[in-house]
Amino acid sequence: LITKGAWEMSDMFEIKAIEMITRYLETAVFEPTNAEARNGMAVAQYIAGMAFSNVGLGVVHGMAHPLGAIFDIPHGVANALLLPIIMEFNAPAALDKYVEIAKAMTVYKEGMSQEEAARAAVDAVRALSVRVGIPQHLSELGIKESDLDKLATAAIVDVCTPGNPREVTKEIILDLYKKAL
């Protein structure tokens, strides 16, 4: 939705995926035999994949990849942990898209400024992450500050990183990892 390659068609898929994740994720996690919720999540991941396969990703995935490769942290967990932190970082570059995210997550209120909608979207993502049991700090996964330089070195050259809507450097990525620690 906010990658450099995003366009109207990919946005349509991503917004629908966000709506479906908002609707089905908690039920799928806490009621694993709920076929409707599991199907909803399967469709959501499929349409999200259709979008990002055509427009690329950004620094969330670029930073998640080394967490998995070096520390064997599941990719979904790494992405979910990093997502609100990177959303905060990227918000100034895509405020209009964050309004759409807030609407898709049903946290947009009429009259909100773009900045307020962005904050509501980030808060909603973080709250959903907490509710489904995602660790909120890399330290909970055994990552130490001494590991961060190695992670940032890998993340800055990751194939996904250049798609980020805001330019990043190794130093910025290191700071983002520190915020996640």
Label each region the model flagged.
Residues 1-55, 171:
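Carboxylate- and glycine-rich phosphate/diphosphate-binding segment that chelates Mg2+/Mn2+
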Residues 2, 6-13, 33, 55, ...:
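Catalytic cores of large soluble enzymes that bind and process phosphate-bearing ligands
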Residues 15-26, 42-46, 60, 64, ...:
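Predominant activation on well-ordered alpha-helical scaffold segments within soluble catalytic domains
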Residues 46-79, 158-163:
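Glycine-rich phosphate/pyrophosphate-binding beta-alpha loops
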Residues 70-147:
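Gly/Pro-rich interdomain helix-loop hinge
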Residues 144-181:
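Short, amphipathic C-terminal "tail helix"
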